[in-house]
Amino acid sequence: MSHPLSSLEYQPDILGEGYEQATLEFLPDTEGTVVATLIRKKTDQPTSKAVLYIHGFIDYFFQTEMAERFNQQGFDFYALDLRKYGRSYMSHQKLYNVYHLSEYDAEISQALEIIGQEGHDTVLLSGHSTGGLITTLYAAHHPDHPLIKDLWLNSPFYDFNMTPFEKKFLVPKLSRLGKRFPEMLFPSRLNRHYVPSLHISYQGEWHFDLEWKKPSYHWVRLSFVHAIHEAQKEIHQGVRLNIPTLLMHAHKTTYPLRFNRNAQTSDVILQVHDMIEHAQKIQGDVQLCSIQNGVHDLVLSEKPVREQVYQQLFQWLENKAL
């Protein structure tokens, strides 16, 4: 469903001054009406460069510091809240429900069309965690997209954080079950210290909506497991990317059973070595960058750490002439 500029209406966004949002409408799915939300923050001066950012699982866009750092570098910043997440969730929907990650192609394509209509000819596509998996495949499946010039991945979800035995035998079985019984539930295993380690009300420094980025989420639908597994299989087989790609990850993974410094200085959600292993299967110009003491969402790491993230990122962009 196309959204020409004449019909697109931006409204003030919850993030405050300078942030706007527009609702993108799509064909209904099995649950009914479907929308996504495009958020933008423009630079003070006209620019032809833009960023499009895609969030992770149980997440939404709230990282204002990231948007403002891109603005300072001369990029207009755009982010999507995908269907059934954050700003885009509707009461008749099951949170985060998806059967195939290609469902999100509609909002990514629509957002890119709008970004082009708004005067940009150069886009850095970016994704965190599940968003990193989604954007990797989007770039691979759209190798000749006229706008996408580079890809920045922040701890992409290239494999389940499970034992080798579970990855080989349990995940494929759960995925097959998910195709037949999509509503069946499975324990999520998400580390319960991660979100509290970030939020200002617990041990962190960030303000975000705990309904949209929940402190705990105990069960996932097998439809999600199936969608992720199918996408990861494609990554594992070796996709081709014809744009420069920067994949950033924390320097280590830990499994804190109670809150400690590891929760704020390492990835407690995904296995770093999985990202490295599967990134090496990608054909193309892919650069890996390890961030000492980084957390899963690297731009939410402690101040000195995230300064390293931005320094490395913007140096890479400069080297790639973006």
Predicted regions and their residues:
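N-terminal cap/lid segment of alpha/beta-hydrolase-fold proteins
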Residues: M1-Q45
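Short beta-strand element of the alpha/beta-hydrolase
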Residues: S48-G56
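Catalytic nucleophile-loop/oxyanion-hole region of alpha/beta-hydrolase
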Residues: F57-I58, G86-T122, V305-R306
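Conserved alpha/beta-hydrolase
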Residues: D59-A67, N71-S91
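Serine-hydrolase catalytic core
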Residues: F186-V286, S290
